[in-house]
Every structure is written in C-alpha cells, then in structure tokens.
From Swiss-Prot:
Cross-referenced InterPro entries: Aminotrans_3, Aminotrans_3_PPA_site, Class-III_PLP-dep_AT, Orn_aminotrans, PyrdxlP-dep_Trfase, PyrdxlP-dep_Trfase_major, PyrdxlP-dep_Trfase_small
Name of the molecule in the record: Ornithine aminotransferase
Stated regulation of activity: Unlike for mammalian OATs, activity is increased by TRX1-mediated reduction of the disulfide bond between Cys-154 and Cys-163. Binding to TRX1 may also induce conformational changes that facilitate substrate binding.
Biochemical pathway: Amino-acid biosynthesis; L-proline biosynthesis; L-glutamate 5-semialdehyde from L-ornithine: step 1/1
Function, in words: Catalyzes the transamination of alpha-ketoglutarate with ornithine or N-acetylornithine and of glutamate-5-semialdehyde with glutamate and alanine.
Intrachain disulfide bonds: C154-C163
Residues with the N6-(pyridoxal phosphate)lysine modification: K262
Description of post-translational modifications: The disulfide bond between Cys-154 and Cys-163 is reduced by TRX1 which increases OAT catalytic activity.
Database matches in PROSITE patterns: AA_TRANSFER_CLASS_3 (PS00600)
GO molecular function: identical protein binding; ornithine aminotransferase activity; pyridoxal phosphate binding
Record localization: Cytoplasm
C-alpha cells in the first residue's frame, strides 16, 4: 500500500496508531507483527513469550494450523448468510457445544460483552414469564469488581470507576455484592424480584481473585433455594484456562446459564455463546434477541475446530498439570521478595500482586518485555500470567526464570 511506505520503525507504527486511532487503550510500547504458538514477534523480529494471550483468547496457541485451515476452508464457501436462513455449519456447532457441555440450547453471539448482555435479557425475561416478577421490577445481582465488558449494560453492572465515570445514567436494577461472600449474597437473593446472579468463577480483571472452595457450591444452593438463575461468566475462565473445560467443573456445580467467549475461536474470530436448558432459553422468541454476525457459518466452523484442538491436544489437562508447579515455583523463588504482596491462581490463570506503594507495576511489565516476556498490569498493582495452554514445561520453566530475574531486579533497589 503506497500510503504506508513511511512506516518503518516501531515508533512510526506507534505514532501512526496514536494519530489515527481513538485513545481508548494505553498499550505497552511494542509493535507486534506475527505470532506462532506461545510466541509473538515484533517488527524487528524480537521474540517474546505471550503471557497475556489476548486475555485468554488464544488458549490453543497463536495461529493454530488446524483452526486456521478450518477458517480458510469455510471462507471459500460461505462466510455469512444472517440468521434469516439456516446454514450447514451453525447446527453442527450448536450440537457440538450443547453435547459437550450438557445443555439443551446455545445462543451464539460475537463478544463476551454480548454474551453478558444476552444473559441480562435472558434473566429478566425468565423472571417475568416464569418467576412472575412484576413488570419492570426484575433485579440482577452481580459481584463488586466484576468485569463483563464496556457496553452500557455491562458498565451498569460494574463498580469500576474507570469504566463508569461520566457514562451515566445506567441501566437500573443491578445490585452489587462482595465477591466470595455467601452471607451478603443470601441477603440479596431473599428479594423475590431477583431473577439472576451472574458471577465469574475466578475474577480475572479484578486481579485473578480465586474464591474459597465452598463459594460456588454455596452459590448454587442459594440460587436453588430462592429460585434465581445461577449464571457463570466463563468468558475468561472457561475452555481449559483453569485446568478444566469449565472452571465450575472444579466445584461439581452446574449453573443454569454459562457464558463463553474468547478461546471459543482460538483467537481467530470474535465468537461467544450462551448455554442454557430449554426451560430458560426458550423464553426468548424469534425477533426478541439476535445479531447479524452471531452464529455465522465462518464463526461456527472456527468454533468447532477450536474445541477439537482443545480436546484432542488435551490442553485442559496441560493447564491442570503445569499450573500448580508453576505457581509453587514462583512462590519458592520469590518468597523473600520485598515488593510482592501475593502470588495466586488456578490452572494457568495466574497473577502476581505487587506492593504498588513500593514499585510501579507498569515498569515491571516493561522490564519483562525487555527480558522477552509480554503481559499487562491490572489496576496498577497486579500482573497477569496467562500463557497459551499449549506451553510446555520447559518453556514454562524458562518463563519462570524470566519472571524471577525481573522481580529480583526491582527487589535489589530495596
């Protein structure tokens, strides 16, 4: 392209993006050009371990050849036809997803935010038509410090100032309770107008907050007791990230509704899904909800192959096998660190929380980049450690060395 011939250096690309793009993100100053497996490469061909994985979108690894081939083959035949017509691919995808996860129905969308918006509508509709809540009185309970997206509905359910400041007025009837607090939850669920409780099995954007072992079983029991839909937002935790196909499987509970996204496409295409049984899903009738791109043939074919890769390559098992030793290794090597507050995680959804009164966490991210590993901070105090699930023990050991070396560099200042 003639008009981009002036773009040669990383600074050129960064300045070009800052000049022509909206400033709704604040990226780490690295310009990525290509990726494969657990690695990404910048415009100078420097290689980095990817420890953000596009917020757990590339669980299967970057540019997986099987997913890529499925994408190309489907694109040669039919990419989109809208839901005005049936397609070969969609029904196959729906059958695969529902059989795999044990639900009657799935509603396909594009993004995690759309999956959550779908859940809001589904809970309300069920509340009015099944639970018989009075008109316009349905209430949804969520957890403080949750993250579900940045649409108006999602930020109405949020307590994060950066997402909510100067964007009001918000959608009504969202009640916020502390995460991992069954007593506070029960007080809210006693309200007969509550139709749903939406919860992340592990709070990702909050800094990888892992609940106590009795929390999700307690949530399940309380929702049954008060006739409230239990909705698990597995957009980030699902599809192997925590060592199980769904994070809720660690706790042997089955939510009424499950939300999926991100790794549903292996990072190749925006795909999300909402799963529920007929008694819940069929309250939505034709024309009441949908998306032009939701469930398109291209997305459906990519989704099927992404799930095939996850299962055939035993990526859930790999995350389960490597996650514990990875965390324990970090804790052992960094037990004397003066700047670390906590090291925590589940499977390969891990994080280090730093004492941000002592150290600038963004500086740690920049030093990690310099040492060959990229990730991003959360709320100026926590660094996420979420590699693709195809990572090997040898690669993870090398990454542990990079992380330990980087932390000790900052520790030496104290």
């Amino acid at each position: 392209m003639e008009f981009v011939k002036d773009l040669k250096t990383p600074e050129d690309y960064i300045n070009n993006e800052l000049k022509y793009g909206a400033h709704n993100y604040d990226p780490i100053p690295v310009v990525l050009k290509r990726a494969k497996g657990v690695f990404v490469y910048d415009v100078n061909d420097k290689r980095y371990y990817d420890f953000l994985s596009a917020y757990s979108s590339v669980n299967q690894g970057h540019c997986h050849p099987d997913i890529l081939n499925a994408m190309i083959n489907q694109a040669k035949n039919l990419t989109i036809c809208s839901r005005a017509f049936f397609s070969v691919s969609l029904g196959i995808c729906e059958r695969y997803l529902t059989n795999l996860l044990g639900y009657d129905k799935v509603l396909m969308m594009n993004t995690g935010a759309e999956a959550n918006e779908t859940a809001y509508k589904l809970c309300r509709k069920w509340g009015y038509e099944v639970k018989k809540i009075p008109e316009n009185m349905a209430k949804i309970v969520v957890c403080k410090n949750n993250f579900s997206g940045r649409t108006l509905g999602c930020i109405s359910a949020s307590t994060t100032n950066k997402c909510t400041s100067n964007f009001g007025p918000f959608a009504p009837q969202f009640s916020k309770v502390p995460y991992n607090d069954l007593e506070a939850l029960e007080e809210e669920l006693k309200d007969p107008n509550v139709c749903g409780f939406i919860v992340e099995p592990v709070q990702g954007e909050a800094g990888v907050i892992v609940p106590s072992d009795n929390y999700l079983p307690g949530v399940y029991n309380l929702c049954k007791k008060y006739n409230v839909l239990f909705v698990a937002d597995e957009v980030q935790t699902g599809l192997g990230r925590t060592g199980k196909l769904l994070c809720v499987h660690h706790y042997n509970v089955k939510p009424d509704v499950v939300l999926l996204g991100k790794a549903l496409s292996g990072g190749h295409y925006p795909i999300s899904a909402v799963l529920a049984n007929d008694s819940v899903m069929l309250v939505i009738k034709p024309g009441e909800h949908g998306s032009t791109y939701g469930g398109n043939p291209l997305a459906a074919s990519i989704c099927v192959e992404s799930l095939n890769v996850l299962i055939n390559e035993k990526l859930c098992e790999n995350a389960d096998k490597l996650g514990g030793p990875f965390l324990e290794g970090l804790k052992k090597e960094l037990k004397d660190s003066k700047i670390i507050r906590d090291i925590r995680g589940k499977g390969l959804l891990c994080a280090i929380e730093f004492k941000n009164e002592l150290v600038n966490v963004l500086d740690i991210c920049l030093k990690l980049k310099e040492n060959g590993l990229i990730t991003r901070d959360v709320h100026d105090k926590t660094i996420r450690l979420t590699p693709p699930l195809c990572i090997t023990k040898e690669q993870l050991d090398e990454c542990t060395e990079i992380i330990v070396k980087t932390v000790k560099f900052f520790d030496e200042k104290f």
